[in-house]
C-alpha cells in the first residue's frame, strides 16, 4: 500500500504541524498534542516512557501491572501538563475496577483510562466499560481491542467509550492470527472503523474516535494509519529497545514481548491452563538509546 502524491501549498516540511486538538463523545475534556501513543505493554508502558512522551506532547498508556501505591505516587507528583498525556490501563477483572476506584480515593484524580482486553467481543465487555464510565464521568476512556464497525459503535454508544482501540493480531510480538486464524487486515479495519466512529455525533457534534493499535513496523505504517483516518496510532515494537523501556541490555539487545506471550505469563504468575494458548512471542530488539 502506498499513498498517491497530492498537490500541496506547503513549501517546506518545517511548516507541517502534526499536533491535533480533540473533543470527545462522552468526556468533556479537551486534548491537545501529537496523537501517537506508547502501547500499554510491560516493556513500553513505563513511568520513564510516560515522562519522555509527555515532554513532546505524545501519549503513554501505562501497563496495568504497576502497584497501586506506585501509581498514586506517580500521579500526585506530576501536574496536568504531564498527566493529560498519561493513560491508566486496566483489564476487566472486578479486582482491577476496585483498584481503579481506590486510586481515585487515594489520589483524588479521575485519570484518562485505557480498558484493554485481548477480545473486545467478549460478553460483558461493553457492560464493564459502561460501569467504569458511570463512576468516571470526567475521564477520557479508550477501550478495545476490536476490528469491526459494529463493535466500535456498540462501545461508543452503549459502553461510554470515547476512543476505540482497533486491531486484532497485527502487533509485531503478537501471534493471535497465526494461532487462532482470527483477525482483520489492519489498514482496512482502521478505515472501516473510523467511518463508524466518526459517523456517531453527540448532541453537540462531538464524535467517536479510533486508535489504530499494532501493525506499525516503519514510520510509513504510521502515516498510512493516519491516512486511513485514525485519530491516534499506538506503537509498541517501534519504541522497544529504548532507555525508557523496562529491560536489560544484553549484547546490544533488549527483550520485547507480547502481553499474551509465555514471558508475560511467567512474569505475572499467570497459570498455564490447558485451555490457555500462547498468542505472543518474545523477541530481542537492538538497543536504540534514549
Question: Each PLM stretch: what is its role?
Answer:
Residues 2-11, 159, 181-290:
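Alpha/beta catalytic cores of nucleotide-metabolism and tRNA/nucleoside-modifying enzymes
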Amino acid at each position: 500500500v502506498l499513498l498517491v502524491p497530492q498537490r500541496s501549498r506547503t513549501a517546506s516540511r518545517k511548516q507541517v504541524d502534526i499536533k491535533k486538538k480533540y473533543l470527545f463523545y462522552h468526556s468533556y475534556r479537551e486534548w491537545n498534542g501529537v496523537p501517537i501513543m506508547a502501547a500499554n505493554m510491560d516493556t513500553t508502558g513505563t513511568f520513564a516512557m510516560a515522562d519522555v512522551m509527555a515532554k513532546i506532547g505524545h501519549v503513554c498508556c501505562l501497563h496495568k501491572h504497576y502497584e497501586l501505591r506506585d501509581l498514586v505516587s506517580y500521579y500526585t507528583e506530576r501536574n496536568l501538563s504531564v498527566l493529560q498525556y498519561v493513560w491508566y490501563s486496566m483489564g476487566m477483572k472486578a479486582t482491577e475496577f476496585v483498584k481503579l476506584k481506590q486510586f481515585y480515593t487515594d489520589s483524588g484524580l479521575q485519570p484518562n483510562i485505557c480498558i484493554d482486553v485481548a477480545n473486545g467481543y467478549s460478553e460483558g465487555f461493553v457492560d464493564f466499560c459502561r460501569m467504569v464510565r458511570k463512576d468516571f464521568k470526567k475521564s477520557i476512556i479508550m477501550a478495545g481491542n476490536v476490528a469491526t464497525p459494529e463493535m466500535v459503535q456498540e462501545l461508543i454508544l452503549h459502553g461510554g467509550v470515547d476512543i476505540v482501540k482497533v486491531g486484532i493480531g497485527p502487533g509485531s510480538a503478537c501471534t493471535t492470527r497465526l494461532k487462532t486464524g482470527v483477525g482483520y487486515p489492519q489498514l482496512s479495519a482502521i478505515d472501516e472503523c473510523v467511518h463508524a466512529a466518526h459517523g456517531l455525533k453527540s448532541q453537540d457534534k462531538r464524535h467517536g474516535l479510533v486508535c489504530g493499535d499494532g501493525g506499525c513496523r516503519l514510520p510509513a505504517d504510521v502515516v498510512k494509519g493516519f491516512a486511513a483516518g485514525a485519530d491516534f496510532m499506538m506503537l509498541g515494537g517501534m519504541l522497544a529497545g529504548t532507555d525508557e523501556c523496562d529491560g536489560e541490555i544484553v549484547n546490544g539487545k533488549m527483550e520485547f514481548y507480547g502481553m499474551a506471550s509465555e514471558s508475560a505469563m511467567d512474569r505475572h504468575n499467570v497459570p498455564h491452563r490447558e485451555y490457555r494458548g500462547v498468542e505472543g512471542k518474545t523477541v530481542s530488539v537492538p538497543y536504540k538509546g534514549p
